[in-house]
């Protein structure tokens, strides 16, 4: 006997859990109760299959993320366009920083006192779904987005970090199968390009997470997956310079988007890899002109041998040189305010300075450049160096200023033999001051974008950064002289003279910052806020000592603080220094009011108003 009649039970019997007789069009129970008998013939499955909900959740997250990115880009394009009714030229911030915009824009017509920063939040730890990852671990992107990020990198990042050969990179950028080091480098390049872009800034979080994961995976992943060595030291895998470049770019990106301590850890990792690969000894065996011949042995390339190398070989060698000097500049300048000991010292470097950018990218045979110590000793040679080589020389000069300050702090005065130590101090001080003054005089004048005549000067933000760096060295030397205990009247007179030089240098920095167009802040070096804060701190501490401070003193401090406000929208280091500067200015206002009266009150009111505007726009 059948336990159940054929057909489906009606909804009323299913609700009551009663035995339906399945009579159509109305069963007996529904007929007795006077209810409508409803039978559902087709029902949906009782539950999802295994993994179906997880897949739907990933797809939904990806769709929502893309929609939010597109919505943010549309909102940014509609809100950040600058209208011509403001007396300024209309600039589309969603486009890349094109050289044609530089020709048409002007320096004086852009009002730096009305900041409109794009809102970039600090990077937060996120998890990227496996469906968005390629087998290499990279984030899956469309071909158009990859091309845009590569273009943005060479327009905005490469001018301040010129260590990659464009043609060589583009030859393998679109390949699906590349080495792990090149995959990490490609992802790091696109990560920092997105971080310095207005249209891809929201997408940089996922790119950063993928790049960081790829680099850390290369650290813990051995050739056979074991945590101990299974080969001899000589047969272990070599450190590819693309891996060092990826860590350096990640460190630059973290200066923009993360706390300074995290960025210092990434830069330390890059320097340690660089030391293991011995990139500082590339040209040790060039000839008898090598300055440091006591270092360990490493493969090197002599100038005569370089002329006979194929294009790919000498380009790779030059990339290694530029990788070393990029790490050297970052190591020197990241300690501008903290006096943190550097890890790369000029005494250990046996690598020639980088060749001119035009020759490097154009594929011309390299001209042998000089070494850093001999270039520092011949001040006349600095005029013929490229912008990147000048940046290396000036970064080393600033590093010597920090070492000079550290030596002065280690000596206590007065003590036995203090007179000879005082002479040594002023001898070092005068040499450094003369080198800094010569650098400020020989620097090419910074031109407005519409005044640039050539491709090199038109798109070279490193030249303006070099000038600011030379002025910052003058300020650092003045602070060192002020901090030292004066023994004689001559010491006091010398310190006052260096203060006058530093004051003029701080005004020049403020003038350069004032003339800079707002869109140029997307192409500034990540450690530029250190130099801006150094100048603002010097003007803040020296201005109250004068009886009647000039009006341009107040304007200089104001422009420097507003510049930090602009940079804070794209640079986390600038955001931290802006908060610190705001606290310093508030503390100095109470002291300065007693000395100077209402002028400082006006400055404080003006500066606080602009900082409040920037904080309001950032919070929105």
Swiss-Prot record:
Q: Which source organism does the UniProt entry give?
A: Penicillium rubens (strain ATCC 28089 / DSM 1075 / NRRL 1951 / Wisconsin 54-1255) (Penicillium chrysogenum)
Main location per UniProt? Answer: nucleus
Q: Where in the cell is it found?
A: Nucleus
Q: Which residues lie in Polar residues bias regions? A: 291-308
Q: What is the lineage of its organism?
A: Eukaryota, Fungi, Dikarya, Ascomycota, Pezizomycotina
The role this protein plays is:
Transcription factor that acts as the main regulator of the gene cluster that mediates the biosynthesis of sorbicillinoids, a diverse group of yellow secondary metabolites that restrict growth of competing pathogenic fungi but not of bacteria.
Entry's PANTHER family?
A: C6 FINGER DOMAIN TRANSCRIPTION FACTOR DBAA-RELATED, ZN(II)2CYS6 TRANSCRIPTION FACTOR (EUROFUNG)-RELATED
Quote the protein name from its UniProt record. Sorbicillinoid biosynthetic cluster transcription factor 1
Q: Where does the record place the region Disordered? A: 285-308
Matching InterPro entries: TF_fung, Transcription_factor_dom_fun, Zn2-C6_fun-type_DNA-bd_sf, Zn2Cys6_DnaBD
Give GO terms: molecular function aspect only: DNA binding; DNA-binding transcription factor activity, RNA polymerase II-specific; zinc ion binding
Query: Which positions, given as ranges, span the membrane?
Result: none
What keywords does the record list, in alphabetical order?
DNA-binding, Metal-binding, Nucleus, Transcription, Transcription regulation, Zinc
One Gene Ontology cellular component annotation held by this UniProt entry: nucleus
User: What effect does gene inactivation have here?
Assistant: Abolishes the expression of the entire sorbicillin biosynthesis gene cluster, and consequently, the production of all sorbicillinoid-related compounds.
* One Pfam family cited in the UniProt record for this chain: Zn_clus
User: Alphabetically, which GO biological process terms does the record hold?
Assistant: DNA-templated transcription
Record feature DNA-binding region, as residue ranges? 10-37
């Amino acid at each position: 006997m059948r336990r159940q009649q054929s057909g489906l039970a009606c909804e009323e019997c299913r609700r009551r859990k009663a035995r339906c007789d399945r009579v159509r069009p109305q069963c007996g129970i529904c007929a007795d109760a006077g209810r409508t008998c409803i039978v559902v013939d087709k029902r949906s499955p009782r539950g999802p299959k295994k993994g179906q909900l997880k897949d739907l959740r990933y797809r939904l997250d990806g769709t929502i993320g893309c929609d939010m990115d597109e919505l943010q880009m549309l909102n940014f394009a509609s809100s950040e366009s600058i209208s011509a009714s403001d007396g300024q030229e209309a600039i589309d911030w969603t486009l890349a920083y094109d050289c044609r915009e530089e020709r048409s824009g002007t320096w004086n017509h852009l009002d730096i006192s009305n900041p409109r920063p794009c809102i970039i939040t600090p990077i937060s730890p996120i998890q990227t779904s496996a469906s968005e990852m390629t087998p290499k671990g990279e984030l899956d992107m469309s071909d158009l987005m990859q091309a845009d990020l590569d273009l943005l990198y060479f327009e905005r990042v490469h001018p301040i970090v010129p260590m990659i050969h464009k043609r060589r990179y583009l030859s393998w950028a679109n390949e699906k199968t590349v080495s792990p080091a090149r995959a990490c480098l490609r992802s790091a390049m696109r990560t920092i390009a997105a971080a310095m872009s207005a249209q891809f800034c929201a997408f940089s979080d996922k790119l950063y997470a993928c790049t960081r994961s790829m680099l850390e995976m290369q650290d813990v992943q051995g050739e056979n997956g074991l945590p101990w060595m299974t080969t001899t030291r000589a047969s272990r895998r070599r450190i590819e310079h693309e891996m060092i470049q990826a860590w350096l770019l990640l460190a630059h990106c973290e200066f923009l988007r993360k706390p300074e301590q995290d960025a210092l850890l990434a830069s330390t990792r890059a320097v340690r890899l660089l030391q293991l690969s011995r990139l500082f000894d590339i040209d040790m065996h060039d000839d008898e002109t090598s300055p440091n011949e006591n270092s360990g042995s490493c493969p090197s390339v002599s100038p005569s041998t370089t002329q006979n190398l194929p294009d790919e070989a000498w380009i790779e060698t030059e990339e290694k040189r530029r990788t070393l000097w990029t790490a050297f500049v970052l190591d020197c300048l990241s300690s501008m305010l903290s006096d943190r000991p550097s890890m790369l010292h000029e005494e250990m470097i046996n690598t020639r300075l980088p060749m001119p950018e035009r020759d490097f990218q154009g594929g011309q045979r390299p001209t042998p450049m000089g070494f850093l110590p001999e270039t520092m000793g011949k001040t006349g040679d600095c005029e013929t160096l490229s912008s990147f080589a000048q940046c290396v020389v000036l970064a080393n000069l600033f590093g010597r200023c920090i070492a000079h300050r550290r030596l002065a702090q280690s000596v206590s005065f007065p003590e036995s033999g203090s007179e000879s130590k005082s002479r040594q101090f002023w001898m070092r001080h005068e040499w450094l001051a003369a080198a800094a003054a010569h650098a400020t005089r020989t620097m090419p004048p910074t031109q407005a974008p519409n005044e640039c005549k050539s491709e090199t000067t038109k798109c070279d933000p490193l030249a303006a950064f070099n000038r600011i760096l030379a002025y910052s060295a003058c300020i650092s030397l003045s602070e060192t002289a002020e901090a030292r205990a004066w023994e004689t009247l001559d010491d006091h007179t010398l310190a006052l003279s260096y203060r006058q030089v530093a004051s003029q240098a701080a005004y020049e920095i403020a003038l350069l910052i004032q003339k800079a167009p707002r869109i140029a802040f997307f192409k500034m070096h990540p450690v530029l806020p250190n130099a801006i804060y150094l100048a603002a701190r010097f003007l803040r501490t020296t201005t109250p000592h004068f009886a009647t401070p000039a009006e341009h003193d107040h304007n200089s401090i104001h422009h420097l603080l507003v510049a930090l406000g602009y940079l804070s929208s794209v640079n986390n280091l600038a955001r931290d220094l802006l908060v610190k500067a705001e606290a310093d200015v508030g503390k100095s206002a109470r002291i300065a009011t007693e000395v100077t009266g209402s002028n400082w009150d006006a400055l404080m009111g003006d500066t606080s108003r602009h900082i409040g505007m920037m904080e309001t726009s950032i919070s929105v």
